[in-house]
């Protein structure tokens, strides 16, 4: 059942997951389509997530956006009023202060993560939640798995001291699994869909931005999701018996790596299980 509508406000809207955005030419969604998207969300009782580009929107757009309950996903370069802030670098050359009340998403390549993971503890002090997204998880090798396991163990050691405080930090790679008792995945195509600036619906932003992506309907004619059952957990034979509940189970990566939207790649499965194991070890260390 649909719960969320993700609206890309511009062709250059910030990527916030595993995918990249190769588009460089600004192209705003039309005001007509923006209004229609909000009306649809109201009718279907959907929470709207607006994904912003790296520039300030015209005032008229902001006025329309404020007519509905929503969440703002913004790049760190232009994040005034953001609920979720997206970054893609570990350094903070401009001296921006992190907001203790905001959620931060750090998109990073594996080598950068392996080199800078010691900064995670420092970041957790200053944010409400930190999500780290490995943008090249599909390239993991056996050596990378070993390194990832080691890094997660080091991070768990860092977090153990934090967990002795009154508030346990929220960090997707380690603390999510501790709090879950069922799958909590991306669920694109089932619990959320994306509206692109061209007025068409897509499973997620990656399907709009990829050269081999496909639409699943439009505002005028409604949704047309072929084999929609394949996006549901009930039709994911491997995942529905898994207990790595924090796994993103990225639908786009599934299709990219296995050609099946309901079948994750080896790389996704192994990294998710390493996170689950590290989370278990951390939980056992907490007094």
Regions found by a protein language model. Give the residues of each.
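Flexible mid-to-C-terminal extensions adjoining Fe-S/redox cofactors in radical SAM and related proteins
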Residues: 208-287
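A C-terminal junction/extension of Radical SAM enzymes
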Residues: 129, 138-211
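Short, histidine-centered active-site or binding-site loop motifs used for metal coordination
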Residues: 21-23, 134-138, 175
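Extracellular/mature segments of secreted proteins
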Residues: 6, 25-31, 196, 258-259, ...
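Canonical Radical SAM [4Fe-4S] cluster-binding loop centered on the CxxxCxxC motif
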Residues: 1-36, 40-44, 249
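Radical SAM/AdoMet-radical enzyme domain recognition
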Residues: 32-143
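Class I S-adenosyl-L-methionine
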Residues: 6-18, 56-57, 133, 170, ...
């Amino acid at each position: 059942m649909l719960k969320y509508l993700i609206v890309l406000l511009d062709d250059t809207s910030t990527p916030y997951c595993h995918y990249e955005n190769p588009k460089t030419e600004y192209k705003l969604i039309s005001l007509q389509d923006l209004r229609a998207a909000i009306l649809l969300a109201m009718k279907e009782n959907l929470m709207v997530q607006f994904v912003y580009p790296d520039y300030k929107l015209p005032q008229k757009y902001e006025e329309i956006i404020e007519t509905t309950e929503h969440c703002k996903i913004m790049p760190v370069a232009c994040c005034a009023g953001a609920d979720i802030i997206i970054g893609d670098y570990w350094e903070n050359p401009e001296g921006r202060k992190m907001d203790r009340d905001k959620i931060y998403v750090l998109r990073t390549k594996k080598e950068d993560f392996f080199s800078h993971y010691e900064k995670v503890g420092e970041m957790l002090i200053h944010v409400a939640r930190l999500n780290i997204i490995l943008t090249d998880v599909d390239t993991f090798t056996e050596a990378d798995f070993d390194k990832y396991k080691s890094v997660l163990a080091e991070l768990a050691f860092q977090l153990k001291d934090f967990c002795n405080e009154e508030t346990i930090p929220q960090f997707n790679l380690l603390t999510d699994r501790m709090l879950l008792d069922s799958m909590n995945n991306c669920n694109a195509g089932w619990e959320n869909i994306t509206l692109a600036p061209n007025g068409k619906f897509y499973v997620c932003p990656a399907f709009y931005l990829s050269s081999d992506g496909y639409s699943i309907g439009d505002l005028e004619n409604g949704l047309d999701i072929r084999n929609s059952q394949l996006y549901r957990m009930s039709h994911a034979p491997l995942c529905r018996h898994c207990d790595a509940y924090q796994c993103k189970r990225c639908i786009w990566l599934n299709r990219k790596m296995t050609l099946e939207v309901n079948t994750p790649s080896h790389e996704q499965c192994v990294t998710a299980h390493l996170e689950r194991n590290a989370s278990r070890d951390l939980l056992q260390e907490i007094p």
